[in-house]
Amino acid sequence: AMSRRQRQMCIRDRVKAKGARAVVGVSTEEKAKICRDYGADEVIVYGTGPKDKEEAKAFSAELKSKSIKGGYDIIYDPIGDCYAEPAFRAIGWKGKYLVVGFAAGQIPKLPINLTLLKGASVVGVFWGAFTGREFEENQKNISDINRMLSVGEIKPLISKEIPMENAVEAIQMIGSRGVVGKVVLVN
């Protein structure tokens, strides 16, 4: 299974491979550098997130300023919490807001009138259910990713290779969120 960070890197790779622009939000400068090195067009370091309405408004304005059209066609949100509403406010007309998870902890409450004002859609993306309910489509996606990997259109970030006998160390690294990219176990 992929960690949230690994899914984000894979999505960013697929977005870039399809010719779209990737604006990425991260919590630290270290992650920002990695995203820039791996081709993100813009990177926003959001730190601990907006703490009040003014900070949320400023965060949304910063997000909008990085878009070309004054709003995004697609927002992929694995974070939720206090980041969700400012991100949704940065969506463009007829944009799609993909709800992927709630890594920041709290399930956000969005003012539903924003969907009306922006003609936007909120879409739940739950890969676990998708694999069973839409098996054939999932297989097509996996084949597409494998093809992109084989021709070098996407390149996973391998942050560390660890001998198989140290698998426990690898699991601990991933569990502590101390890894950006993939940890590969080798014989």
Where are the regions that the model predicts?
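Short loop/turn segments at beta->alpha junctions
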Residues: 80, 163-166
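Glycine-rich phosphate-binding loop and adjacent beta-alpha segment
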Residues: 18, 26-29, 35, 82-154, ...
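Short conserved AdoMet
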Residues: 4, 68, 92, 178-179
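C-terminal capping/lid region of NAD(P)-dependent oxidoreductase domains
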Residues: 146-147, 151-160, 168-187
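Single conserved hydrophobic/aromatic residue that forms the stacking wall/gate
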Residues: 1-7, 11
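Active-site loop of short-chain dehydrogenase/reductase
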Residues: 6-7, 71, 92-97
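Adenosine-nucleotide cofactor-binding segment
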Residues: 16-83, 137-140
